[in-house]
Amino acid sequence: MTLRINDIAPNFTASSTQGEINFHDWIGDGWAVLFSHPKYKTPVCSTELGEVEKLADEFAKRNVKTIGLSVDTVDETSSWLEDISDIAGAKPSFPIIADTDMAVSKLYNMLPTLEEGTSDGRTALDNETVRTVFIVGPDKKIKLYLTYPMTTGRNFNEILRVIDSMLLTSSHPVATPVNWKKGEEVIIKPSVKDEEAKKLFPDGWKTIKPYLRKIPDPSK
């Protein structure tokens, strides 16, 4: 199944390092980041999981839950946690899905649906496409997905930046420009005509082009 932005994130029930999880129930009324890993005890993924734990407070204050996924058993994944603590100085407190039968990886289009067997005997290279980040909104829709090569670690400060943009643009009729960071100027959406913009933004705006109007961050 091909997944696109604004599709409903497929629901599933799966085992994890914190027991059985129903994904939609687990998300609740907040946001979620699901990020996947091809195999336990792989070097790049170990640094990523540790970094997400270090950023736990940043995700929490944005009402965002994080959940990992690895194509392994619960025991294998659980045995990885101490290694992550040694490597990154932080042991993951968030759940990691043990996708033993690869069902979630297939459901989320990270592995071919016709792929047979279980995680047993598979290597990280067999699962190299299981390197995707999904951001899911309170409406359970996919807001973003990014797939990374095995040799490139993910930038979770960038994930937080994207979440800040989504939180702002979901509550104000604006968009965020290139390299935007929280607190910087934003762009009035082109669909908002000048007459409506005058009511929404009575302090006015800076016109770069008729289709590019900038205002201060309206959340400040």
Please describe what each predicted stretch is:
Residues M1-K220:
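Chalcogenol-based redox active-site neighborhoods
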